[in-house]
Amino acid sequence: MDIKRTILIAALAIVSYVMVLKWNDDYGQAALPTQNTAASTVAPGLPDGVPAANNGASADVPSANAESSPAELAPVALSKDLIRVKTDVLELAIDPVGGDIVQLNLPKYPRRQDHPDIPFQLFDNGGERVYLAQSGLTGANGPDARSTGRPLYAAEQKSFQLADGQEQLVVDLKFSDNGVNYIKRFSFKRGEYDLSVSYLIDNQSGQAWSGNMFAQLKRDASGDPSSSTATGTATYLGAALWTAGEPYKKVSMKDIDKGSLKENVSGGWVAWLQHYFVTAWIPAKSDNNVVQTRKDSQGNYIIGYTGPAISVPAGGKAETSAMLYAGPKIQSKLKELSPGLELTVDYGFLWFIAQPIFWLLQHIHSLLGNWGWSIIVLTMLIKGLFFPLSAASYRSMARMRAVAPKLAALKERFGDDRQKMSQAMMELYKKEKINPLGGCLPILVQMPVFLALYWVLLESVEMRQAPWMLWITDLSIKDPFFILPIIMGATMFIQQRLNPTPPDPMQAKVMKMMPIIFTFFFLWFPAGLVLYWVVNNCLSISQQWYITRRIEAATKKAAA
């Protein structure tokens, strides 16, 4: 049975790593070519069906008429006269042409730990990549559907900042056309990553006005700047949306390459996901919207929606709005904003284990204030939960260790007659009340927990740049000096010494190689995960040593 146990351990090690790689295939970002630099100078485009414009606006705006075909137009450069907005958690730039958010930084989330003054940049439309949030009014009278191009909004000032003691900031952009006055209003709240984008329509034209609000996210094919593939893994980079039948539906870049998607949805949301961060447009819950994904002529990927028709009589007023979230994947906040949005923190097929683990880990952290110590306490709780199972396993291995001399005698007695040897071993196990597979059970049980915790540490933004102590300054990435993986390998070696020695020399050599193999695998795993395994091994060693000594003492006493 030792060879079976050896094979099982080796298989589980390989399977666990293959499962992680499989996760990369199913959920990871596609290896797509980076966007051409020329595309990064393209203006925010307009939806399909917009008539040819003499100002060269591109064909990004979704048409209110589903049968319309896109007009391909020459792109133009972005307006240099951007409107800057700064709150305590957001720094963004709005292009007055169309009122799109073309740049967005997250000052609370540094790009790198060694440069805390440089914020992570989520949106960018003027550098080497394209990622922006667009919105407008299309349809029969929508200003974004004009033949002369998208509206040029005016603001009272070019810079807005949320002042100390101020809880809300409102930025109004104004535009008038043919007797209709438009205000595009951005409303920000202190400490919040969600903002409201509203359109106030004042129809003084003398005739009825009609149109539709649209909102969309546009991104190029460049990689995820917030993700690391050091372990051969990558988190999901792509679009997602909510439908009545599927609260979290992913639409990858490959899916969009295959063809556009169009669905009628009541309420819901559309989002673009990357490692740790998400951007989502959230329309009113009562609105019946047309959700669409597609790829534009510059190779950018678009997901968005067009809202229901808005009618404003002559002399009347109307307002329509949507919410934009652009920030970290904080599960509690996302759940408040819209049903299913918290599922963008994607724990994969083991979500039913990962979510309770994160919930417990979060509560421990609220008491301790350090994610490293929280992982240690979590490990102790998990070990306590599996204590009866582990104890039974260690008792079985201790008895195996006690009968090792008898097994050696059987090997000497039967030599190469493996059939008789196996029969004699099974009779011995039955007589000594030993379960030869008992030592494998804890490994089988721990693997789902191990993999679920891996994805918790990989996906949860709370772990990003979270320090523990000393040289571990980020639990979400590998140990920079590989100290924890080496300690983990040492604990595996010690634990192995407590196990019964396989009677076959080849099996014994294979078992001795296992700590080295595991250490190699763990070199590039997140430090938080290795910390969990080190603590788990230390607790297992203590428990196994105690049980082994008790059984050996009882065996000696019975023999006397």
Curated annotation (Swiss-Prot):
Keyword Membrane: yes
Biological process according to GO: protein insertion into membrane; protein transport
GO-annotated molecular function: membrane insertase activity
Domain of life where this protein originates: Bacteria
Pfam families with a match to the protein in the record: 60KD_IMP, YidC_periplas
Cellular compartments annotated: Cell inner membrane
Description of how the protein assembles with itself and partners: Interacts with the Sec translocase complex via SecD. Specifically interacts with transmembrane segments of nascent integral membrane proteins during membrane integration.
UniProt function note: Required for the insertion and/or proper folding and/or complex formation of integral membrane proteins into the membrane. Involved in integration of membrane proteins that insert both dependently and independently of the Sec translocase complex, as well as at least some lipoproteins. Aids folding of multispanning membrane proteins.
Name recorded for this polypeptide: Membrane protein insertase YidC
